[in-house]
């Protein structure tokens, strides 16, 4: 079993999505019936590779069939794509599609197609080109995180693109919202729980070629409720929503801490927490109420 992991994050090995991909691979190895020695894993970190944009010259179809005129790392990528049994596409969602560096890699797969027009076999789209190589039997898994509270409804263009060049229904997805939380060590109890579910998904995929409905449902569960996450996310920028001015780090920390308040625990009594940063001589108040939490900087409470 040859696994090819394509990390399309501009952050390289610091990618949040890559953490999910590694968990999936760990689970896959545990669930695979093959000896671990027979499983090879090849990683391509696109951010550190030299892959230029396609020129649209179509030399790879006419002048040098199957060979791109651009001499860079893409030829190696194509060789590995042809050789792999399972391909993991790991990437973040920044602006409703894959990052530009990964899109370059996808576009540069043009030499892998024949130039002659063909009909789509899955009824998706209005035309196609047959593959130059035998790609039947290859498995694909898309693993991605995004910065919205939920992945739902934000990957439409990603799905349509992969439907076109992989074929509709020919790949599995793990899309997770609130992706930036995977780098916050203080929230690791929750994110590690999610990574364990991704690991379970990898084991199931190795054994059955799919992810169970039960596990998929858990993967679609929000890391934190929408209101909690969006408060944390807004505070993380360190910029005032009203003035646009930069806020001190201790205030950012206080706002993020306050956002974790669970309003369902309200017992009928409002409470005020006052925090003194003695080294900075800053004082903040957090009001905990039936409707949620609010941070005050003027000592009014």
Which sequence ranges carry the predicted segments?
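Beta-strand-loop-alpha "switch" segments that mediate conformational coupling across diverse proteins
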Residues: 171-177
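A short acidic, helix-capping loop that chelates divalent metal ions and anchors anionic groups
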Residues: 181-185
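Feature captures hydrophobic
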Residues: 237-301
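N-terminal beta1-alpha1-beta2 submodule of the flavodoxin-like/Rossmannoid cofactor-binding fold
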Residues: 1-114, 192, 196-245
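Short, glycine-/small-residue-rich phosphate/pyrophosphate-handling segment
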Residues: 101, 114-169
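Cofactor-binding loop segments of dinucleotide-utilizing enzymes, especially the Rossmann-like FAD-
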Residues: 8, 46, 145-147, 176
